[in-house]
């Protein structure tokens, strides 16, 4: 900044007698000031140089020395082998929960072997008791499981021996073949562990075969005997057994079919006419009365034996019954069974 000043001499009219001068006064240059400036500069340079050298030395020291991680100081107790040996010996002697004074004594004794505090001794006894309880419980559970497994194995082996004994491992084939009049279909093989079942089946099977055989034989015998009897016995026999024949109609039908089958199987054809029966009525009256009782018993036995077999099919009566040639005049209204009727069919004449 410059200011205008007044020139008293007035020599310069162009400037109007005025001139510019600075607001801040100029510093006068002196040799002492230059010396001071040079000395400060030298001091600063020396400080910078020393600092740089110190930094270099520190870097060199860091590079030359190995780097170690910082050591972390832990507050956890690390027992020494001697301390553990003393504590385990005290535990074996019976010390489980020591008192405060006893803990202080143990701590003072163990400080000779390393760093330790009273709380470390207390927690060591507590943890040792807990570990011993867990170990005992684990042993008990393992022993119980072994006992259960052994018991289960014994039970399973015993049950297997009872289920499949060596004496009963016999595979029996029930292949019984019956005689005349029985089914010849063999039974399926089956494994039997009981000896009573095949005997019962065999008895039932033989009973059925015997019943069929007896029925066929009785049917043939009865048919032949009834063919030789007079007509008067037919009506009396029918009157005596009318109720049984009505009540047991399926049995009568089955007997009819059995007797007819037996007669056809024997291939004997017998033809009896009504005239022949009338002529024999007078001569065989006493024989009829004498044989009547035997025939009644035989027919009753036949009805009883045939009544037990209900599996036979019923047969239909294909032809009506004839009563004129077989009954007397007083007994024409009575029904006559179809087992005593025989027909002879002759060829028709053209």
UniProtKB/Swiss-Prot annotation:
InterPro entries recorded: HD, Homeodomain-like_sf, WUSCHEL-like
Keyword annotations from UniProtKB, A to Z: Developmental protein, DNA-binding, Homeobox, Nucleus, Transcription, Transcription regulation
The entry's DNA-binding region: 72-136
Superkingdom of source: Eukaryota
Main location: nucleus
Residues making up the signal peptide according to the UniProt record: none
Molecular function per GO: DNA binding; DNA-binding transcription factor activity
A GO BP annotation: plant organ development
GO cellular component, one term: nucleus
SUPFAM superfamilies, A to Z: Homeodomain-like
Location in the cell: Nucleus
Intrachain disulfide bonds: none
Region of interest (Disordered), ranges: 283-308
PANTHER family assigned to the protein according to its UniProt record, in alphabetical order: WUSCHEL-RELATED HOMEOBOX 1, WUSCHEL-RELATED HOMEOBOX 1-RELATED
Family listed: Belongs to the WUS homeobox family.
Primary role: Transcription factor which may be involved in developmental processes.
Protein name: WUSCHEL-related homeobox 1
């Amino acid at each position: 900044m410059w200011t205008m000043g007044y020139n008293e001499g007035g020599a310069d009219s162009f400037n109007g007698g005025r001139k510019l001068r600075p607001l801040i006064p100029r510093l006068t240059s002196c040799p002492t000031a230059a010396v001071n400036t040079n000395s400060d500069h030298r001091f600063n340079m020396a400080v910078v140089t020393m600092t740089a050298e110190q930094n270099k030395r520190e870097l060199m020291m860091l590079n030359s020395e190995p780097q170690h991680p910082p050591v972390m100081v832990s507050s956890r107790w690390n027992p020494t082998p001697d301390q553990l040996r003393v504590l385990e010996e005290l535990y074996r002697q019976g010390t489980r929960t020591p008192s405060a004074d006893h803990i202080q004594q143990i701590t003072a004794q163990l400080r000779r072997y390393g760093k330790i505090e009273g709380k470390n001794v207390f927690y060591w006894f507590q943890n040792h008791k807990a570990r011993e309880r867990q170990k005992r419980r684990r042993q008990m559970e393992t022993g119980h499981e072994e006992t259960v497994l052994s018991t289960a194995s014994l039970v399973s082996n015993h049950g297997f021996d009872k289920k499949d004994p060596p004496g009963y491992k016999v595979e029996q084939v029930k292949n019984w073949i019956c005689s005349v009049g029985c089914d010849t279909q063999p039974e399926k093989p089956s494994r039997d562990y009981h000896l009573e079942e095949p005997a019962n089946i065999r008895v039932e099977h033989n009973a059925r075969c015997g019943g069929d055989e007896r029925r066929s034989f009785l049917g043939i015998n009865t048919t032949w005997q009834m063919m030789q009897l007079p007509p008067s016995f037919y009506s009396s026999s029918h009157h005596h057994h009318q109720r049984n024949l009505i009540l047991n109609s399926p049995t009568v039908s089955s007997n009819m079919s059995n007797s007819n089958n037996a007669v056809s199987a024997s291939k004997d054809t017998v033809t009896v006419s009504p005239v022949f029966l009338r002529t024999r009525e007078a001569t065989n009256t006493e024989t009829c009365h004498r044989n009547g009782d035997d025939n009644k018993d035989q027919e009753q036995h036949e009805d009883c034996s045939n009544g037990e077999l209900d599996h036979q099919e019923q047969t239909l009566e294909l032809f009506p019954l004839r009563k004129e040639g077989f009954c007397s005049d007083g007994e024409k209204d009575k029904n006559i069974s179809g087992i005593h009727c025989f027909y002879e069919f002759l060829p028709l004449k053209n």
